[in-house]
């Protein structure tokens, strides 16, 4: 009886540890806009630097696990997460695996947000989406 209880307790501890480890692995994956910072004032032409953790940047058309490429959303909402990310002036694709770009925007307030796409430009099953930042472009 004691041996059976010990096995059950061991299995429960192992299960809890596995769930915590899996949750940590998922939470350690993220994309972030490194520069500019939220609330920053920038010139009309400025650089945007992208960060990624827990995944590897790869060109579009790469279908290996834990890889993807950045898409920058400018002044727009998130796209449908089940479809390829649109390509337009509001949804910029960085299909060569780039980690930065230079933008020119009109003066005023703007929002920027990153989303990682897979080899087909579709967000991952656990989408990696940055916080939306707001910047002000100087005249």
Residue ranges of model-derived segments:
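N-terminal signal peptide c-region/cleavage motif recognized by signal peptidases
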Residues: 18-20
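Short beta-strand elements
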Residues: 126-139
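A glycine-anchored, Pro-Gly-centered beta-turn/N-cap motif
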Residues: 44, 106-108
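Short coil-to-beta strand junction motifs in C2/discoidin
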Residues: 62-70, 129
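Short acidic/polar inter-strand loop motif in beta-rich domains
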Residues: 79, 117-125
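Short, compositionally biased P/S/T/A/G/V-rich stretches that sit at domain boundaries
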Residues: 24-43
């Amino acid at each position: 009886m004691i041996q059976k209880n010990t096995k059950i307790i061991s299995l429960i501890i192992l299960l809890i540890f596995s769930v915590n480890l899996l949750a940590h692995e998922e939470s350690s994956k993220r994309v972030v806009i490194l520069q500019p910072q939220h609330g920053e004032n920038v010139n009309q032409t400025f650089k945007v630097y992208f960060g990624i953790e827990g995944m590897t940047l790869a060109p579009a058309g790469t279908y290996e696990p834990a890889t993807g490429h950045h898409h920058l959303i400018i002044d727009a909402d998130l796209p449908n997460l089940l479809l390829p990310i649109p390509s337009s002036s509001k949804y910029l694709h960085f299909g060569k695996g780039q980690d930065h770009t230079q933008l020119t925007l009109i003066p005023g307030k703007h929002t920027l947000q990153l989303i990682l796409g897979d080899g087909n430009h579709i967000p991952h099953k656990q989408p990696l989406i940055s916080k939306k930042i707001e910047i002000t472009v100087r005249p």
